[in-house]
Amino acid sequence: MKKDPFHNSTVFWDTASVFVHHYLPDIRKVSPNTVIAYRDSMNFFIDYLDTQQNIKRKDISYNDFSKDTIRSYMDWMLNVRKLSPKTCNLRITAINSFLKYSTDQYPSLMAIYVAVSSLDMVKTTRKPIEFFERKQMKALLNAPDPRTRTGRRNRMMLILLYDTAARVSELLELTLD
């Protein structure tokens, strides 16, 4: 029979470890950067519980993931830490993802997941997308020297990045099959 996940810190830590080190990279196949972002988000929440809620790290359990605690964490991130709404939302999304994963392992945690996931995200304002003017784009694409192999490669990379809106890291991971 499985241990009570609500008050057992070992269950929490074991599940958190599997979530970060196995589930995200091996099952969900998210990028290494996403794994790092989710791990850091979990660590920031754990630090908050330790420093602001006076819950020792070794004593943290799912019982500490109440809707009120998450709401106060959001307020603390915005008003004390002065984090951007986008950063706050990222950290809450990571917690929600972890809790959703946890319900697969321990269905009795569903009430916690539902309560926390019902919290509204922080409203964000979208900045308008600024585009290069034709003259700027032409200057950028003409910057690499077309007489050299490296220049032609760099120009092609710039064109590919612009046309696909890919990140440089995504472009570098492309391989020929």
Q: Which residue stretches match the model-derived regions?
A:
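Conserved catalytic core of the tyrosine transesterase superfamily
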Residues: 1-177
